[in-house]
């Protein structure tokens, strides 16, 4: 927070948006093996509508949709008509897409864990995290870090984390958020209905 107040990084609003699994998803989740539960909760269909609503809330901003599960990211890219960058994306294509994002030709970019490391996208002012590496504090900091480059406009960045309520997804999110709270970032918690009515 000290370096934020000195202008070295942008201020950020951190928002957790809680979705509720539908009846079918809850049944599948309840009967799943423990190691499958996080993936099921992270990939709930309810998150897609919330992502679309959040993008609509930020019509002029550069947005990163970040996740862990490739099938989820590919479906997200298709639904949003947005390009996808994963570890499978050739380096030249990644560079082309990153440049298109920087210049504004591409406004929404769907990215996997490759975005956690060594990319500089100061134009990004909104990140929507749909899934992550369990309770990784390092990953949370890296993803928030994508947004904290100083903005020419002095604009506040927005960091959204989409969580499936009453699941291990919510448990892991609390661990990641605890780290950011220790760094001085507060989370606002919203119900998905407040975003995607």
Language-model regions, residue ranges each:
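Post-DEXD/H (motif II) to motif III coupling segment of the RecA-like Helicase ATP-binding lobe
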Residues: 1-16, 180
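A short beta-strand element within the Helicase C-terminal
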Residues: 108-110, 117-133, 139-142, 158-162
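Acidic, low-complexity intrinsically disordered tails
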Residues: 188-197
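Conserved interdomain hinge at the start of the Helicase C-terminal
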Residues: 13, 24-78
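Short, charged, surface-exposed secondary-structure boundary motifs
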Residues: 91-98, 136-145
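Conserved helicase ATPase core of P-loop NTP-dependent helicases/translocases
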Residues: 62-66, 71-119
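Conserved segment of the helicase C-terminal RecA-like domain
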Residues: 146-179
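Short glycine-/polar-rich loops that comprise or flank the Walker A/P-loop
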Residues: 9-13, 122-126, 152-159, 183-186
């Amino acid at each position: 927070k000290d370096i934020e107040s000195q202008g070295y990084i942008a201020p950020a609003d951190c928002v957790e948006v809680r979705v509720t699994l539908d009846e079918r998803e809850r049944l599948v989740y309840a009967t799943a093996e423990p190691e499958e539960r996080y993936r099921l909760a992270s990939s709930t269909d309810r998150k897609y509508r919330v992502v679309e609503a959040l993008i609509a809330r930020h019509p002029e901003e550069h947005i990163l949709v970040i996740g862990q599960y490739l099938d989820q990211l590919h479906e997200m890219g298709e639904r949003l008509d947005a390009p996808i960058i994963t570890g499978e994306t050739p380096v030249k294509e990644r560079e082309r897409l990153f440049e298109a994002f920087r210049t504004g030709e591409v406004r929404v970019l769907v990215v996997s864990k490759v975005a956690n490391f060594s990319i500089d996208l100061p134009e990004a002012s909104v990140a929507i995290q749909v899934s992550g590496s369990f309770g990784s504090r390092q990953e949370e900091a890296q993803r928030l870090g994508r947004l904290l480059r100083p903005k020419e406009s002095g604009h506040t960045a927005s960091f959204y984390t989409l969580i499936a309520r009453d699941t291990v997804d919510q448990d892991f999110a609390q661990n990641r958020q605890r780290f950011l709270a220790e760094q001085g970032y507060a989370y606002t918690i919203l119900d998905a209905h407040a975003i995607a009515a």
